[in-house]
Amino acid sequence: MKNPNRKADVRRAADGIANRADTLVVVASHGGSAIQYAKWISDILETDMVPANRKYLGYTSLYKNIIYVGCVKEGRIDTLGLLQQNYANFNLDGKHIITVAVGLGDPTDAYLSKLMEYNALTSFGESFYFLPGRSSVEKRKAGEMVKLDRCMKDLPKLYGKEDAEVIGLRLAKGYDGVDREKIQPIIDEIQAVRSNRYQPEISESEGSASDGSDDL
């Protein structure tokens, strides 16, 4: 007896393969919350995922939609500059690029504006999102403390007084703002793109994120 659901199963499988082939999640993380967010996004959207390094960044040329997830290090989204520098080489023109920053600050207008400025996001990509991250005091190695002290001294140079104080406190005391629900706007955007329903908004930024290592 033929299975009446067989054709539907085959069609759904084919759709899944097509979706995986149209979107790539690129993640710059060393095992922290940025990679956790990237995995959630990739699983829900059924996409491929690669690390943000010279060996794999070129794969972005093969996909229609790129979701770049990176932890914030002293105002910079980790390794994003390498992708931006190779914009032409990777044929990124015309692709739907979403940049996701994972850091420790609150998503104030001032803080997000600084991140956009430091990472040249006003002229790169379609959308920018900010997700809340994590700072694990227990996981720090002795050698990291010197670097941490220097970073905390530099915070007032990077951000406004209130934003610098929030980040400094979370670095010193530890913080875990990771929230799976925060990725929903990113999921919604890619699903809208896939169904030709996407309409760009004037401003898109949400959340806040960080790596298992400390994000700034």
Region locations from a protein language model:
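The conserved SAM/SAH-binding core of class I Rossmann-like methyltransferase domains
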Residues: 26, 50-52, 100
